[in-house]
């Protein structure tokens, strides 16, 4: 079984963890932005079927 020869430094661990977290953050921001544009009707690349509701008065 392969075993690392030396211990990974704390700074390298933090760099890798921050990079991993940043990828998730960017994906979340992009998803939120797409959801916002779809809900407001300003989306140009995402097609959603519009439904209308009738209210009885």
From Swiss-Prot:
One of its GO terms (molecular function) is structural constituent of ribosome. GO terms for cellular component: chloroplast; large ribosomal subunit. SUPFAM superfamilies: Zn-binding ribosomal proteins. One of its GO terms (biological process) is translation. Its main location: plastid. It is found in: Plastid, Chloroplast. Keywords: Chloroplast, Plastid, Ribonucleoprotein, Ribosomal protein. Pfam families: Ribosomal_L32p (PF01783). It comes from the Eukaryota. Belongs to the bacterial ribosomal protein bL32 family. PANTHER family: 50S RIBOSOMAL PROTEIN L32, CHLOROPLASTIC (PTHR36083), LARGE RIBOSOMAL SUBUNIT PROTEIN BL32C (PTHR36083:SF1). This is Large ribosomal subunit protein bL32c.
């Amino acid at each position: 079984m392969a075993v690392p020869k030396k211990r990974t430094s704390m700074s390298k661990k933090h760099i890798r963890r921050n990079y991993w977290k940043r990828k998730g953050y960017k994906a979340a921001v992009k998803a939120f932005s797409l959801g916002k544009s779809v809900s407001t009707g300003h989306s140009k690349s995402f097609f959603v079927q519009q439904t209308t509701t009738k209210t009885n008065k």
